[in-house]
Amino acid sequence: MGFPGAGGHREGNTVRYRDIAEQPTTVGEPDGSLSQRLRSLAKLLAEAGFKVALSRRMDDWLKTHAVFVTAIAGAIYRAEGSATVLARRRDCVRALVRGIRQGFSALSAAGVVIEPRKLALLFALPAVIPESYWRRYLAHPAAELIFAGHAQAARDEMWAVVEELREIVTPDPRTHAELETLWAAVETAASRKHSLRHSER
C-alpha cells in the first residue's frame, strides 16, 4: 500500500502535478514489515526522482490521510473551489483546522494511530499555529494544483472516501460539527457533478 507525495489532475492525456515537499511518497506493507519487495519499490520510486518514506503503520497512515484530504476538499468546495479563496477566509481555515482535529479525534477513538507523527503534532498545537500555517500554504500558487485541482477532479472519489470513513468512525454532530459540515460539502460537490452530467445528456 502507498500514497504519492504529489497532487494534481489530468488535462486530456496529460497529467499535471507538483511534488509536495512536506509529504514524501509513502509506502508500507499491510503487516507493518519492511519487506524486500517494499524496499525494492522504494528504490524504484527514488530512482524515478520521488522522495520516499517507509511506514510500519501504513493502514493508519492512509486512514489519517483520508480524513485530512476529505476535510481539505470540503473546505475548498465551500470556498468556490479555490485554495486561494480559502486562504483568504480566516473563518473557513479555522473550520478546516477544527474539522481535521475532530476527524483525528474520531480516528483515535476508533483505535487508529494518527500518522505521520509530524501531522499529528501540527494539529495538536494551539489552533493559531496550524491556522496560520494553512493560510500561508493555501495562498501559495502551487496549492491550486496540489489541492484545488485534485479536489475538483476527484469529487466522486472524495465522497467515496467519506463513505468509507463513516464505516470506521461515527462523528458526534454535537462535538464534530465542523467535520460534518466539511463532509457535507464533499457530498454536495459530488451530487452537483452528477447533476451536470445528467443535464448534458
Please name every model-derived segment.
Residues S40, L44, A66, A73, ...:
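Alpha-helical scaffold segments in soluble metabolic enzymes
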Residues T14-E29, Y77-R88, P141-Q152:
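Helix-loop-beta segment of a Rossmann-like dinucleotide-binding subdomain
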